[in-house]
Amino acid sequence: MLVLGLTGSIGMGKSTTAKLFAEAGVPVYDADATVHKIYENEAVPAIEAAFPGTTLGGKVDRALLSAKVVHDPAAMKRLEGIVHPMLRAHHQQFLDDAESSGAPVAVVDVPLLFETGGEKRVDAVVVVTTSPEVQRERILARDNMTPEKLDAILARQMPDAEKRKRADFVVDTSNGLDPVRLQIREILEAAAKMPRRRD
């Protein structure tokens, strides 16, 4: 089974692209959805111990946690030290299940793929992109998003131009869904002929 790593900076259309891969019959692992799941289950005790007052009703309160880590690189590292091992276990379970199902290709949707060295764990990388103007417009339309919070998030992410340079495939979401569907079909055709290269 070939594993495609799907990534892209915030607001690029990565989640929509992931849904379109799933629509094409490809198993898709969603790292963000997995984070939400573990914030409601196994990560709660460790996060409350490391960041007191960030859980409510037995779940991690993302807004409270974000306020404690967004401007503190050391706190962010501590949080990643708690969450990343749990994510890796879920990720491996997904791959095992996808392989058992006989899927020829699987997609792992990981926002910080390059930033966390995740490109070594996939066979090819798909980077989702759009223009900086469209990106900013999409992000600032979200609830609880401010220009300052956006700048802090972007500062932690590899620049889009660098991601595109390191990609095997680039999906441009600037022109609507039909062009994205076509790009996905082309990627899946090319992926069928690629050798496996992950660690």
Swiss-Prot record:
Alphabetized Pfam families for the sequence: CoaE (PF01121)
Disulfide bonds: none
The protein's Enzyme Commission number: 2.7.1.24
Main location class: cytoplasm
GO biological process: coenzyme A biosynthetic process
GO molecular function: ATP binding; dephospho-CoA kinase activity
Superkingdom of origin: Bacteria
Localization, UniProt: Cytoplasm
Reactions catalysed: 3'-dephospho-CoA + ATP = ADP + CoA + H(+)
Chain sites annotated for binding ATP: G11, M12, G13, K14, S15, T16
Pathway note: Cofactor biosynthesis; coenzyme A biosynthesis; CoA from (R)-pantothenate: step 5/5
PANTHER family for the chain: BIFUNCTIONAL COENZYME A SYNTHASE-RELATED (PTHR10695:SF46), DEPHOSPHO-COA KINASE-RELATED (PTHR10695)
Cited function: Catalyzes the phosphorylation of the 3'-hydroxyl group of dephosphocoenzyme A to form coenzyme A.
NCBIfam families attached to this UniProt entry: dephospho-CoA kinase
Name of the protein in question: Dephospho-CoA kinase
